[in-house]
Amino acid sequence: RYGRKPSEWQYPPTNDNLQQQAFALFDRLMIEAVDTECQVSEIAYLNPKRPLAKNKVARCIDMSQLSTSGAFPSGWEMKPFTGGMRFTNGDTLLARITPCLENGKTAYIDFLDDEEIAFGSTEYIVLAPKEDIPPEYLYCLARYPAFVDYAVKNMNGSSGRQRVSADTIGQFVMPCPSETAIKDFGKVASALFMKMKNNSLENLKLSSLRDTILPKLMAGEIDVSNIQF
């Protein structure tokens, strides 16, 4: 099984089921393409340049907001951009530092506005799809057990601050399915990820509403005496 047990808040069972369907499709592609190989750098741009002016207020997604099991982060903040990795819709974020990499800190970005650039930790590796590669394909790869194992085993640095480099990630050798197979995967995966995004956005709205109303209920600021159960 990919990743870890989904958190009750941000990754409900429905989303976990949808994600596992995508992973099953990806697994089948890897099994059926055992006779052909390619490197990640052939299908993905690693840390592509994204334009974002210094001090421009933009959406910031912190490492603490990345899920260890799902594609959607737990939230974000609007901050002036002073540095960090930049990304846009269709990108996959992969934590490159211990213990975040081992814990599965990963995200798929599909909830920004059109042409919006967001930013986050310098400890992210950003994977962006090359031509004809469905963006969901790279997210599934980032959670593929063989890929994660490779990334963890190729970390370097002092104890407690080990990292894997983008160049090393780009050298990962994987099965290379046919263009038709990848295209078919994309058609199904895009629908699954769309459902996951909509579920997560709705869950985020409900959580925000709960956090707003609950303190007022506890403080007696909302009259519930006329509510019938």
Show where each model-derived region lies.
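Non-catalytic DNA-recognition/assembly elements of restriction-modification systems
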Residues: R1-A53, S69, E179-S225
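A residue-level signal for beta-strand positions that form part of recognition/binding surfaces
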Residues: E37, A58, Y124
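Sequence-specific dsDNA recognition surfaces
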Residues: S41-A95, C100-I109, G120
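A short beta-sheet element
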Residues: N89-F147, M155-I169
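Conserved functional hotspots at enzyme active or ligand-binding sites that engage polyanionic ligands
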Residues: V152
